[in-house]
């Protein structure tokens, strides 16, 4: 069995070694909210792309759950894409969108700490072990392929155990983002303001929340906003193409999870009608923390030109990601959505102020009352019963 798996892994590596060069064109390339003029800024573009953390299949890590697989080749691609999206959010949170990575250059301590969150060990908060085991609570067996919505739900639940990054993760439902719910989840009350009377009134609108309300709240919990969508039945509906591309132009953009059936990619931008993506389908050997307490990061950055895909070849089941470090970033995102997304006759998703009356009441997610750490908590899948099962709505074409 091991020899068969090794052969399969090597085959994946060979298939992904070929990366087409970019054409010589005057068109703009958009990468996670930043634009590059391809003809004159190609090296700057490739440097921007290589700074993104790149997570791929790995092998020879400790068996998941003690007796499970020691490689995620063939099934973990969407989990790796989810890791890449989340890692980009953490980069923006601690280092900023304009931070750049250089090979063999000493990096900030925050960078190393971010990287260690994703190592393939059960004690790392966003490891393949944690994600696969949390997926059991979403109805996915360990070793089963995940869809975009399932990965989003897994990240939302794992983030509850991550005190260092302290993210609020909001996953939209029914193609609808609710401003009121996000504000309720992300606002952190001033120290000592623990009574209901100290909470900001729910009636505040998106327009006046950005100004004149700072007295109500001293802090904003950084927001990872994930919007799972289905943009067609068996293939993407062309009516959504322009709105989908607009999302990559937003400064809050974290790209998109998607791809083709059973083949997930992390989409980070576009050139014309081609989506630019990082491909996790390369199998590399597990990397652990070194004796000096740091991680050798050379295999966590893609140093070749990334691949491209015509947007109409994209499977319609996707998940958009956005990061809003401050409340003003979220207010700006709402304005951009109103201007660029909601103007369409057939809207990609809805943005509403109030919580829909026919929905169950919104309860901000909270860490379950357990005495163990997050890593230990999901080491026992029986304890996943404390989480509600989220419906995995995506229906991938076959």
Swiss-Prot record:
It catalyses: [protein]-C-terminal L-amino acid-glycyl-phosphatidylethanolamide + H2O = [protein]-C-terminal L-amino acid-glycine + a 1,2-diacyl-sn-glycero-3-phosphoethanolamine. One of its GO terms (cellular component) is cytoplasm. Inhibited by N-ethylmaleimide. Redox-regulated during autophagy since reducing conditions activate ATG4A whereas an oxidizing environment such as the presence of H(2)O(2) inhibits its activity. GO terms for biological process: aggrephagy; autophagosome assembly; autophagy; lipid metabolic process; mitophagy; piecemeal microautophagy of the nucleus; protein delipidation; protein processing. Its EC number is 3.4.22.-. InterPro entries: ATG4_LIR (IPR046793), Papain-like_cys_pep_sf (IPR038765), Peptidase_C54 (IPR005078), Peptidase_C54_cat (IPR046792). GO terms for molecular function: cysteine-type endopeptidase activity; cysteine-type peptidase activity; protein-phosphatidylethanolamide deconjugating activity. A motif (LIR) lies at residues 393-396. Pfam families: ATG4_LIR, Peptidase_C54. Its main location: cytoplasm. Keywords: Autophagy, Cytoplasm, Hydrolase, Lipid metabolism, Protease, Protein transport, Thiol protease, Transport, Ubl conjugation pathway. The keyword RNA-binding does not apply. SUPFAM superfamilies: Cysteine proteinases. Interacts with ATG9A; the interaction is direct. Belongs to the peptidase C54 family. The LIR motif (LC3-interacting region) is required for the interaction with the ATG8 family proteins. Required for proteolytic activation and delipidation of ATG8 proteins. Cysteine protease that plays a key role in autophagy by mediating both proteolytic activation and delipidation of ATG8 family proteins. The protease activity is required for proteolytic activation of ATG8 family proteins: cleaves the C-terminal amino acid of ATG8 proteins to reveal a C-terminal glycine. Exposure of the glycine at the C-terminus is essential for ATG8 proteins conjugation to phosphatidylethanolamine (PE) and insertion to membranes, which is necessary for autophagy. Preferred substrate is GABARAPL2 followed by MAP1LC3A and GABARAP. This is Cysteine protease ATG4A. It comes from Pongo abelii. The lineage of its organism: Eukaryota, Metazoa, Chordata, Craniata, Vertebrata.
């Amino acid at each position: 069995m091991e020899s068969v798996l090794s052969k399969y892994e090597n085959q994946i590596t060979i298939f992904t070694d070929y990366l087409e060069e970019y054409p010589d064109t005057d068109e703009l390339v958009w990468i996670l909210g930043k634009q590059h003029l391809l003809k004159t800024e190609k090296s700057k573009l490739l440097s921007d792309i290589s700074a993104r953390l790149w997570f791929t299949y790995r092998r020879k890590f400790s068996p998941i759950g003690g007796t499970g697989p020691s490689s995620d080749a063939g099934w973990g691609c969407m989990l790796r894409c989810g890791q890449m999206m989340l890692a980009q959010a953490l980069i923006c949170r601690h280092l900023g969108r304009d931070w750049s990575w250089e090979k063999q250059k000493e990096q900030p301590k925050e960078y190393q700490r971010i990287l260690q969150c994703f190592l393939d060990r059960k004690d790392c908060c966003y490891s393949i072990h944690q994600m696969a085991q949390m997926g059991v609570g979403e109805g996915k067996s360990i070793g089963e392929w995940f869809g975009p919505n399932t990965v989003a739900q897994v990240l939302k639940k794992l983030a509850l155990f991550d005190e260092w990054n302290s993210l609020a993760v909001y996953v939209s439902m029914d193609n609808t983002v609710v401003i009121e719910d996000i504000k309720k989840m992300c606002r952190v009350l001033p120290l000592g303001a623990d009574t209901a009377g100290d909470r900001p009134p729910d009636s505040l609108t998106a327009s006046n929340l950005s100004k004149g309300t700072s007295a109500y709240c001293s802090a904003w919990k950084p927001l990872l906003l994930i919007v799972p969508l289905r943009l067609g039945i068996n293939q993407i509906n062309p009516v959504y193409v322009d709105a989908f591309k607009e999302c990559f132009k937003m400064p809050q953009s974290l790209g998109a999870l998607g791809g083709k059936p059973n083949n997930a990619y992390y989409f980070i931008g576009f050139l014309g009608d081609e989506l630019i993506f990082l491909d996790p389908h390369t199998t590399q050997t597990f990397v652990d923390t070194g004796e000096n307490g740091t991680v050798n990061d050379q295999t966590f950055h893609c140093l070749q030109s990334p691949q491209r895909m015509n947007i109409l070849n994209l499977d319609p089941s996707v998940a958009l990601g956005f990061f809003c470090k401050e409340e003003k970033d979220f207010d700006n995102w709402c304005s951009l959505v109103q201007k660029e997304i909601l103007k369409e006759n057939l809207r990609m998703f809805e943005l509403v102020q109030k919580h829909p009356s026919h929905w169950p009441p919104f309860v901000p997610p909270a860490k379950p009352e357990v005495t163990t750490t997050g890593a230990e908590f999901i080491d026992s899948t029986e304890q996943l019963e404390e989480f509600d099962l989220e419906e995995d709505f995506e229906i991938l074409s076959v």
